[in-house]
From Swiss-Prot:
Pfam families xrefs: RuvX
EC number: 3.1.-.-
CC per GO annotation: cytosol
Protein name per its UniProtKB record: Putative pre-16S rRNA nuclease
Alphabetical keyword list: Cytoplasm, Hydrolase, Nuclease, Ribosome biogenesis
InterPro entries per UniProt: RNaseH-like_sf, YqgF, YqgF/RNaseH-like_dom, YqgF/RNaseH-like_dom_sf
Principal subcellular localisation of the protein: cytoplasm
Family: Belongs to the YqgF nuclease family.
Keyword Hydrolase attributed: yes
GO biological process: one example: rRNA 5'-end processing
Protein role: Could be a nuclease involved in processing of the 5'-end of pre-16S rRNA.
Top enzyme class: hydrolase
Record has Nuclease as a keyword: yes
Organism, scientific name: Coxiella burnetii (strain CbuK_Q154)
Length: 141
């Protein structure tokens, strides 16, 4: 997908919350934009549709959680299922990114910015990191 101005929505999948970020390939930057509530991984698809339309997204990126040794876990399968549903429902190109350590990195960056209040939810910041990783991969192609 190189040499195109792509606008991507990135997702940090969780069973209770799904973080969302938006980014684009012109500046290779991303911003955290939303945390969507989910019930056992099920969410309001209309909210995602609204985000896709609002941001004019033309590609979707989903973080896939693996264990540190690269093995898969229950959440790995659930995130892949979510990714397949996204692609089927909206018909947009989809990329999956290894998201190991994104939540830890999101916390580190939160405190590095001098924000002392303990963050309750970092899902959208984790989505931003997932999307930044994907954007970097696009830049290197």
């Amino acid at each position: 997908m190189p040499n195109q101005n792509l606008i991507a929505l990135g997702f940090d999948f969780g069973m209770k919350r799904i973080g969302v970020a938006v980014g684009q390939t012109v500046t290779h930057s991303a911003n955290a934009i939303a945390i969507l509530k989910a019930q056992d991984g099920v969410l309001d698809w209309e909210k995602i549709k609204m985000l896709i339309e609002t941001w004019h997204a033309n590609v979707l990126v989903v973080g896939i959680p693996y264990n540190m040794d690269g093995s898969e876990q229950t959440l790995t399968f659930a995130a892949r299922k979510f990714a397949r549903k996204l692609q089927t429902r909206f018909g947009l190109p989809l990329s999956m990114v290894d998201e190991r350590l994104t939540t830890i990195e999101a916390k580190r960056q939160w405190y590095e910015q001098g924000l002392t209040k303990r963050p309750q939810h970092l899902d959208n910041y984790a989505a931003k990191l997932i999307l930044e990783q994907w954007l970097q991969e696009q830049k290197n192609e």
